[in-house]
């Protein structure tokens, strides 16, 4: 299958997608009623889009093209209000978090959607297990070559994005000992992790053509890489973050990615090389397992440094770009988070350590998303 031409978009514009949990009180397990909820909200939307994801316990909130994080926040806030209103009418709850802490994957119903049914046929039970919830951020690019450079540049900071957003310590009723267990779900997929090495858009088109020979790839959407180009939108899409518990944190993560993209494309601090990825999966694992307490290893020098320290360095590097984009509030909030030494996974464990239950944890997450 031929690859679409790269659509020219305004550099650094944003699009944000949030995969949300649809909850069934009072037991606070995942509901299988997302279709009912989506049908109820479609006519009420004034901006953005609310749509299905893989299973009937998920729904996706997606902004339109936004010039800055303030516009994105306004769209997401409006959608949040509409969804919460409809959820209340149908006696459902909505929350963030990268995993539901005690749902059973065997109970998950794949949406009655041609693409998802085809994916179920290809991947079997792996698709039901992929009832996990992430935040995706699109950043606009002027051309395909810029998109490939940006993808390689952002790949340096995949551990940082994972650690800052980690919100999935519990799965199937157990503490996984990971800060972000969500990404482990995709480890059995053949396209898990980083995109195979290419140096420009022409090479990427050749890569996509060869991947399509497998008959498992019909479009870019069928590729589950950590970061992928989206030629139809003219963007690079970062896909490694857990869905946050709050809209504010989702906006802060988007602001960081937007500012990092601006810094990368204006300063060009790296000359991408295939060896950059030599320790990619090791550093990614450190972020998933330990969050901000993880340790990064430099593929060239062997130097090791705390992820928290390197994240502060990233935040300092992108601060001038954030000011130009109106995203400095996001950088300030994330800097404070790192200095306090926590993420949402840590909060969840503290809730349980203080005597809370997993049912109570999901109830609390619904209250947090509703602003209670």
From Swiss-Prot:
- KW Ligase (keyword) present: yes
Provide the E.C. number(s) assigned to this enzyme: 6.3.2.2
Catalysis: reaction(s) = L-cysteine + L-glutamate + ATP = gamma-L-glutamyl-L-cysteine + ADP + phosphate + H(+)
Which keywords does this Swiss-Prot/TrEMBL entry list? Answer: ATP-binding, Ligase, Nucleotide-binding
- Gene Ontology molecular-function annotations: ATP binding; glutamate-cysteine ligase activity
Answer yes or no on keyword Ligase.
yes
Q: What Pfam families does the entry give?
A: GCS2 (PF04107)
In terms of InterPro entries, this protein maps to: GCL_type2/YbdK_subfam (IPR050141), GCS2 (IPR006336), Gln_synth/guanido_kin_cat_dom (IPR014746), YbdK (IPR011793)
Which cysteines share a disulfide bond? Answer: none
Oligomer status and interactors: Homodimer.
Q: What does this protein do?
A: ATP-dependent carboxylate-amine ligase which exhibits weak glutamate--cysteine ligase activity.
Instruction: Please identify the protein, giving its name as recorded.
Output: Putative glutamate--cysteine ligase 2
Source organism of the structure: Salmonella paratyphi C (strain RKS4594)
């Amino acid at each position: 299958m031929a690859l679409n031409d790269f659509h020219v978009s305004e550099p650094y514009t944003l699009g944000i997608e949030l995969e949300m949990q649809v909850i069934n009180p009072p037991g606070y397990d995942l509901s299988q009623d997302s279709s009912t909820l989506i049908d109820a909200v479609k006519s009420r939307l004034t901006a953005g889009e609310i749509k299905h994801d893989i299973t009937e316990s998920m729904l996706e909130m997606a902004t339109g093209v936004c010039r800055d994080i303030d516009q994105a926040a306004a769209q997401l806030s409006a959608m949040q209000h509409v969804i919460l209103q409809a959820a209340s009418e149908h006696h459902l709850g909505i929350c963030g978090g990268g995993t539901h802490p005690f749902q059973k994957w065997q109970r998950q119903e794949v949406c009655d959607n041609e693409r998802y049914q085809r994916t179920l046929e290809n991947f079997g039970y792996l698709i039901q297990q992929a009832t996990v919830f992430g935040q995706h951020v699109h950043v606009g690019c002027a051309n395909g070559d810029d998109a490939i450079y940006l993808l390689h540049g952002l790949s340096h900071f995949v551990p940082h994005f994972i650690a800052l957003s980690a919100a999935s310590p519990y799965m199937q009723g157990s503490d996984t000992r990971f800060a972000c267990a969500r990404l482990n779900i995709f480890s059995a997929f053949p396209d898990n992790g980083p995109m195979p090495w290419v140096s420009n858009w022409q090479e990427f088109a050749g890569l996509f053509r060869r991947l399509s020979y497998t008959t498992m790839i019909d479009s870019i959407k069928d590729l589950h890489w950590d970061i992928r180009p989206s030629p139809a939108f003219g963007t690079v899409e970062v896909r490694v973050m857990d869905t946050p518990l709050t809209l504010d944190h989702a906006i802060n993560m988007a602001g960081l990615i937007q500012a990092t993209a601006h810094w990368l494309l204006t300063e060009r601090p790296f000359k991408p090389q295939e060896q950059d990825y030599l320790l990619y999966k090791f550093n990614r694992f450190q972020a998933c397992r330990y969050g901000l307490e993880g340790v990064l290893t430099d593929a060239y020098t062997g130097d090791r440094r705390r992820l928290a320290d390197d994240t502060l360095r990233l935040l300092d590097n992108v601060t001038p770009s954030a000011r130009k984009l109106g995203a400095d509030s996001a950088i300030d909030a994330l800097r404070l988070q790192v200095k306090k030494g926590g993420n949402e996974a840590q909060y969840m464990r503290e809730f349980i350590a203080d005597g809370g239950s997993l049912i109570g944890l999901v109830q609390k997450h619904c209250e947090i998303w509703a602003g209670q």
